[in-house]
């Protein structure tokens, strides 16, 4: 891959998917729960990875732009037909468990309105319109949401 930033982003996407699949115990390629990198679809981007009912937008950059990223993730969730979009921002010098997972206030409100997350870690609120978990905490949220919800079509 000629573009170093693109190569770094692709590595982060793969690392992130491998991490969350390992934490949740997903490994079979036909398992609908497997977190998978999404194919590039052109003008209507559908996120970097799919973790039903979330799309994951991975970011491996030094300077965060979280509100902009969240607008992107929310639009990509709509394009993919998923209810929720989140951003997974790599933290330099830390492993994937410590990455930051950001969710917009609006999306978080819909999530807690649809699911009982009382047993899950509480995300840190921001004054800029979003909440944040670590990737390890988000994996527990994903597990809880999936226990109550599954896609209409299981592969």
Predicted regions and their residues:
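Catalytic phosphate/metal-binding cores of nucleic-acid and nucleotide-processing enzymes, i.e., regions
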Residues: 1-155
